[in-house]
């Protein structure tokens, strides 16, 4: 008996049998040990062989365990085990059987055949489990498929389809695939190509997320339901698992062997299998080493002959990048283009999937939620495709509701945490003896009783509501199972079972569900089990930062009072504030053009009058933070080549991978305020880029991605015509001044650029009263900084007027005021604080004496 003539799996099993005997203190390795090792082998061939022969493997395993328990145990042998005479005889018999079959290597299944020829304990166990010599010989022939064992890895290559593919038709029969709604044209076209004589290989091409894999699942479901032409009736759809095919292929040629085994088995099936290769481009170059042949080239002969019915799926970009380069592979496939479904089709798809998601999350998905998911994802999520992005919204919204149902309600959690906090305080105060502590303890105990009572009441309500929801979940699961059983009975033609389910079980469950739902309909105070359009809007708002959720009363009031909020920081400039506020209100009320930015403005006026300040104020109003302001200083874009920094460098240039300054900022924050400061200083070519943004609300970056600007406010500032504003201030009306300024502007900017801007706003120069108002705002900011150091600041009206008077300059606006404040107030204050003249805790009074500021405490 030569071990080197055994297959790798058989050699491994003998090593495992030795370990088993050693662990149980047996002196000899018996046939029982080897049989147990073969049964326990990972991805071994004996377990599936016996199962295929109809032998009860679990019964055989328990019989083997009983026999192994009876074997004598020998201690103190020092780990010395050897093959028993019975096992040597069986292995020699295996060698004889292999020679008889003209095999070069002895495979594991011959051991079972050899064992059945004997009459020892192993033969008895096999016979009790239902194995006979004739049955095993038949099964071995089926498994081998007429092939000889010419390779030590021959056992690994058997049952290749079972190991390296997933049976989609089997999954469809079990009801594990999601229903496929619509897509009839694409499925029909796929079937049409599959029925060709040669090159009967469709490849589904479309953007990621449009449902290419779903079309193949739909085909599998139609085959199972018999809704296909005679040519492909009763065929199986197998999905190739590329991961399993490549995983563990350590040595050169192992991957090719596995793929060849798959192709050989497919050839034996004689056209009864349709192979589905998802991500088809992975086949090109897969397994390619130095001079090795890749998977794509191995498939070509089978594809061209028509031996292999193959359906591929890949994206447009990857098809161009990998498949089109290999013309010989491309011509063997027939393209089937899969377009993105419309919003109406997406709604139909979501309605079909609704029950599956309800069953998974144990929540109810309302129809308004489905409509909202399709319409909102189409409008606000621009970088992905329907129906995938709409399904994601439904899934995540249902998940959030489910999470709230499973976890403690926030209000109850808050009360319980407060109770713990109060108990800790109570323990600390109980150790104190003074009067104040005792009074505090009494108040605290009263509050604790109140909090515990509320928490107990809420906890009871929560438990009741949770129990009510659990009832409907069980009924829904039973109803889904009954419907699956009905489908199985219909396919099997079992009319008795069909009538029992259709007219008995299903109507009864539907009635129970209706009653349970009515009980649930009563107003729930803590739990929600319905996904509505509000939840969809919340999920979308969190993901994109775009406020699409329903406006609360407070937000409506805030929007109506928007001018007041903006005027807190922007003094004067009523026309500019009104224009911006109206644009934001139009957008939030849903009246703005969905294909353009929320608003685009050109702010014109002299320096220091509040053009940039209004943008900062708007960003703070919308996002509670000035960091949401995307500020681009256009003076940096004075050269022609600098334009590429906005949208990203073109291919072949340094920095191509990094993306553009403007496009990347908007991709990350689709809802933002974009400030293009000092726009007249930029190169004229910059405005060519802005034309597309202002008109269609989109821009293509250097990598060909479309960036959505439809949820941005675009503000450009310029100093053009500031001399006219200065001269005309006081004696020209606003409309006269605006027309004079626009006359200057038209000479600098092209008409097609100006024509696309929503509104050009002219800012007035600031008068003395405005400057005084701004001075009070800046002193409030200084007061806040001093408060951090425990100083309070009080300033008289005369001192404020003096600072405003010093800082007033009609040409330079409010900027000289800042310098005046630094020189007249901040510098002397800093010196006094450092000298220790002013003490913390006491108010600092600033007054005006003889035209100078005086600081005293």
UniProtKB/Swiss-Prot annotation:
One of its GO terms (biological process) is cellular response to heat. Residues 3-146 form the Clp R domain. It is found in: Cytoplasm. ATP 2 binds at residues 605-612. Pfam families: AAA (PF00004), AAA_2 (PF07724), AAA_lid_9 (PF17871), Clp_N (PF02861), ClpB_D2-small (PF10431). Residues 766-857 are annotated as: C-terminal. It comes from the Bacteria. Residues 391-525 form a coiled coil. Keywords: ATP-binding, Chaperone, Coiled coil, Cytoplasm, Nucleotide-binding, Repeat, Stress response. Residues 341-545 are annotated as: Linker. Residues 555-765 are annotated as: NBD2. Its main location: cytoplasm. CDD domains: AAA, RecA-like_ClpB_Hsp104-like. GO terms for cellular component: cytoplasm. One of its GO terms (molecular function) is ATP binding. Belongs to the ClpA/ClpB family. The Clp repeat (R) domain probably functions as a substrate-discriminating domain, recruiting aggregated proteins to the ClpB hexamer and/or stabilizing bound proteins. The NBD2 domain is responsible for oligomerization, whereas the NBD1 domain stabilizes the hexamer probably in an ATP-dependent manner. The movement of the coiled-coil domain is essential for ClpB ability to rescue proteins from an aggregated state, probably by pulling apart large aggregated proteins, which are bound between the coiled-coils motifs of adjacent ClpB subunits in the functional hexamer. NCBIfam families: chaperone_ClpB, PRK10865.1. Part of a stress-induced multi-chaperone system, it is involved in the recovery of the cell from heat-induced damage, in cooperation with DnaK, DnaJ and GrpE. Acts before DnaK, in the processing of protein aggregates. Protein binding stimulates the ATPase activity; ATP hydrolysis unfolds the denatured protein aggregates, which probably helps expose new hydrophobic binding sites on the surface of ClpB-bound aggregates, contributing to the solubilization and refolding of denatured protein aggregates by DnaK. Homohexamer. The oligomerization is ATP-dependent. This is Chaperone protein ClpB. It comes from Shewanella oneidensis (strain ATCC 700550 / JCM 31522 / CIP 106686 / LMG 19005 / NCIMB 14063 / MR-1). The lineage of its organism: Bacteria, Pseudomonadati, Pseudomonadota, Gammaproteobacteria, Alteromonadales.
